């Protein structure tokens, strides 16, 4: 297997920004001409913790201008993109997360353009943005987002560190919301996230609401236009990406979400490859050697390549004996070699594995109500009535019709 010509195998985390990736950063003639980003450029923003940042928002369409000040409290994430820090709004006391990224003055930031119109309970919301400069005259874009204190990665680690499995109810609740967020971004703005993993899934520990975050690798995929294949963190990377496909679809996110589901069920990554070639080996050990047709669906250039013939490992043997059969069935529908055979995010939401969440008396284990799960809007646009009826429980439909009559 080591001779597979699968391209470079650097770090587990693919670089979030590739300038040769289509329109990774859209060309902009003049930075200051973007009226929606008319916030003042803040100077002297070298320090983070304890630093106070003041910026002006509003002032469009006759709105009054408003000064908002943030006190930077602590760094919560770092990467090749820059840093994310928690801050407190001094005017309201509200906690926010600010992602600070180095900005090329010649381009628009794609993450900002994609996040602006997004509005969904399971997607992190962008409050506003502003620019800041350092003493070295570097320009930074600051994305101000809602602050959610936990990640799915840390929640899972809480269980595994004490040799426990995540309760199956929480596996259902968290993965359902992941698919609901993906259903929204895939259908409404038409965005592929391209880096779905536990670290990019935020969890509110009180409400157990899940939010998809970090759109630094995200892109609107246009049919016929090539994209980079070296994308997505390794353990969650779809096989067509490992095969070097450049005309992939949003089904790469479905594969990643399937890997997250399996990880929550197992307590560890399903495909823990040490490099790109080993990643494919780990997948083949479970799914077996792909057929010629499956290889053609992933990347037609590989159909004549000879792979060692390995039989698929039965899914029920991948998981422990007491695993609900619905969980195994869902994992098998998500983790398919052929991208077109993977179920869509909406179809995943309707899967029987999540039926417990649709019960009229469904509650959190502590008796509190569930986070919003059925307030679908635009993402149902292309769905069949049969699918909609499976997605929205009868008791919710009755409430909706009663509400409409009363209004």
UniProtKB/Swiss-Prot annotation:
The active site is at residue 195. Keywords: Acetylation, ATP-binding, Kinase, Nucleotide-binding, Phosphoprotein, Serine/threonine-protein kinase, Transferase. Pfam families: Pkinase. Its EC number is 2.7.11.1. ATP binds at residues 76-84, 99. CDD domains: STKc_GSK3 (cd14137). The modification Phosphotyrosine is found at residue 230. Coiled coil: none annotated. Autophosphorylated mainly on threonine and serine residues. One of its GO terms (molecular function) is ATP binding. Residues 70-354 form the Protein kinase domain. GO terms for biological process: brassinosteroid mediated signaling pathway; hyperosmotic salinity response; protein autophosphorylation; protein phosphorylation; regulation of protein localization. Residues 1-19 have a biased composition (Low complexity). Residues 1-23 are annotated as: Disordered. It catalyses: L-seryl-[protein] + ATP = O-phospho-L-seryl-[protein] + ADP + H(+); L-threonyl-[protein] + ATP = O-phospho-L-threonyl-[protein] + ADP + H(+). Binds to KIB1. Interacts with BSK6. Belongs to the protein kinase superfamily. CMGC Ser/Thr protein kinase family. GSK-3 subfamily. Phosphorylates BSK1, BSK3, BSK5, BSK6, BSK8 and BSK11 in vitro. May mediate extracellular signals to regulate transcription in differentiating cells. This is Shaggy-related protein kinase iota. It comes from Arabidopsis thaliana.
């Amino acid at each position: 297997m080591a001779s597979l010509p699968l391209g470079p195998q650097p770090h587990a985390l693919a670089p979030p920004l590739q300038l040769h990736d289509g329109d990774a950063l859209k060309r902009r003639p003049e930075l200051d001409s973007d009226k929606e980003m008319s916030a003042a450029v803040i100077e002297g923003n070298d320090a983070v913790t304890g630093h106070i940042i003041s910026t002006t928002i509003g002032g469009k369409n006759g709105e009054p201008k408003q000064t908002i000040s943030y006190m930077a409290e602590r760094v919560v994430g770092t990467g090749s993109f820059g840093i994310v820090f928690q801050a407190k709004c001094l005017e309201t006391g509200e906690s926010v997360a600010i992602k600070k990224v180095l900005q090329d003055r010649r381009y628009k930031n794609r993450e900002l353009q994609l996040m602006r119109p997004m509005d969904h309970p399971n997607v992190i919301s962008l409050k506003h943005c502003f620019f800041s400069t350092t003493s070295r005259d570097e320009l930074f874009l600051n994305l101000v987002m809602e602050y959610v204190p936990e990640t799915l990665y840390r929640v899972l680690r809480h269980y595994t560190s004490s040799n426990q499995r995540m309760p199956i109810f929480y596996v259902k609740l968290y993965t359902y919301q992941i698919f609901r967020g993906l259903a929204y971004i895939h259908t409404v703005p038409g965005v592929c996230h391209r880096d779905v993993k536990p670290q990019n899934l935020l969890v509110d520990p009180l409400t157990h609401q899940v939010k998809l975050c970090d759109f630094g690798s995200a892109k609107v995929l246009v049919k016929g236009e090539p994209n980079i294949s070296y994308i997505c963190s390794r353990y969650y990377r779809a096989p067509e990406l490992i095969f070097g496909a450049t005309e992939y679809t949003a089904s790469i996110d479905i594969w990643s979400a399937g890997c997250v589901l399996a990880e929550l069920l197992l307590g560890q990554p399903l495909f823990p490859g040490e490099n790109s070639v080993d990643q494919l080996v780990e997948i083949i050990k479970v799914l077996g050697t792909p057929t010629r047709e499956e290889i053609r669906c992933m990347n037609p250039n590989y159909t004549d390549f000879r792979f060692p013939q390995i039989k698929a490992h039965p899914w029920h043997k991948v998981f422990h004996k007491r695993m609900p059969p619905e969980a195994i069935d869902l994992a098998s529908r998500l983790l398919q070699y052929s991208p077109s055979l993977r179920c869509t995010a909406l179809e995943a939401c309707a899967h029987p594995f999540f039926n417990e969440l649709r019960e009229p008396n469904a509650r959190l284990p502590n008796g509190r109500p569930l986070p919003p799960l059925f307030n679908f809007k635009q993402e149902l646009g292309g769905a069949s009535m049969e699918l909609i009826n499976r997605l929205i429980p009868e008791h919710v439909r009755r409430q909706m019709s009663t509400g409409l009559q009363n209004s």
